């Protein structure tokens, strides 16, 4: 008989005490067993890739804005008063500056003269 586990046919075994010269042993085809293979296959893979892309885009936009101004310019204008410029020009103008000095002299009131008494000695002179 063939080996049951191998599933092959035409194989046979002979005993050590059987003389092959006079005996022919014929084996029947053996029936093989069935089996299932189980296994877990794992694998890792790495890969690199490159790509290029182009794109176009268009867009339109509208906007409105409002604003209010502050009166900070007023303070600056006060610093540049015309009166200051006039005084500077009068002082720095060569040949155009005229200095006039006017003195007011007040004469104090004269006290009344005391009466003069003439003596005879003065009159006789």
Curated annotation (Swiss-Prot):
Bias kind Low complexity: ranges: 85-112
Keywords from the named record: Biological rhythms, Cytoplasm, Nucleus, Phosphoprotein, Repeat
Region (28 X 2 AA approximate tandem repeats of G-[TA]): 30-86
Residue windows of the Sequence repeats: 30-31, 33-34, 35-36, 37-38, 39-40, 41-42, 43-44, 45-46, 47-48, 49-50, 51-52, 53-54, 55-56, 57-58, 59-60, 61-62, 63-64, 65-66, 67-68, 69-70, 71-72, 73-74, 75-76, 77-78, 79-80, 81-82, 83-84, 85-86
Domain of life: Eukaryota
Gly residues bias (residue ranges): 30-84
Compartment(s) where it occurs, according to its Swiss-Prot or TrEMBL record: Nucleus; Cytoplasm, Perinuclear region
Gene Ontology CC terms, in alphabetical order: nucleus; perinuclear region of cytoplasm
PTM (free text): Phosphorylated with a circadian rhythmicity, probably by the double-time protein (dbt). Phosphorylation could be implicated in the stability of per monomer and in the formation of heterodimer per-tim.
Biased composition range(s): Polar residues: 116-125
Region (Disordered): 1-125
Biological processes annotated in GO: rhythmic process
Purpose of the protein: Essential for biological clock functions. Determines the period length of circadian and ultradian rhythms; an increase in PER dosage leads to shortened circadian rhythms and a decrease leads to lengthened circadian rhythms. Essential for the circadian rhythmicity of locomotor activity, eclosion behavior, and for the rhythmic component of the male courtship song that originates in the thoracic nervous system. The biological cycle depends on the rhythmic formation and nuclear localization of the TIM-PER complex. Light induces the degradation of TIM, which promotes elimination of PER.
Domain notes: The run of Gly-Thr is implicated in the maintenance of circadian period at different temperatures. Deletion of the repeat leads to a shortening of the courtship song cycle period, and thus could be important for determining features of species-specific mating behavior.
Subunit structure: Forms a heterodimer with timeless (TIM); the complex then translocates into the nucleus.
Protein's name in the database: Period circadian protein
Organism: Drosophila ananassae
Gene that encodes it: per
